[in-house]
Amino acid sequence: MAQKKGGGSTRNGRDSESKRLGVKVFGGEYINAGSIIIRQRGTRVHPGANVGIGKDHTLFALIDGQVEFGVKGALKKAQVSVLPRS
C-alpha cells in the first residue's frame, strides 16, 4: 500500500515579466536626439523643452543636449528638459 498521498498540483508558480520602467538618463548627462529619457506609466514626469512624449508616456529627447530635471507650475509637477549644447 502507498504510504503517502499523491502530490497535488499547485495554482501558484507564475509571475509577469518586469517592464523595465524608470529613468534611463539622469540630470546633467548628455543625450542624443531620439534617445529615451524615462519610461513610465502615466505622466509621473512631464515633458519640458525639447522633450517629446510617446503614446505609452515615454519621454525622449528631440535634440542633442544635456538633460535637466526640475519642477513646473504652482502644483510643482516634475518635468524634464533637454538643454542644447553650447
UniProtKB/Swiss-Prot annotation:
One record GO biological process: translation
Annotated InterPro entries: Ribosomal_bL27, Ribosomal_bL27_CS
A GO cellular component annotation in the UniProt record: cytosolic large ribosomal subunit
One example GO MF annotation: structural constituent of ribosome
Gene3D superfamilies, per database record: 2.40.50.100
Keywords, in A-Z order: Ribonucleoprotein, Ribosomal protein
Region: Disordered, residue numbers: 1-20
Ranges of Gly residues composition bias in the record: 1-10
Membership in a protein family: Belongs to the bacterial ribosomal protein bL27 family.
Record HAMAP family: Ribosomal_bL27
Full protein name: Large ribosomal subunit protein bL27
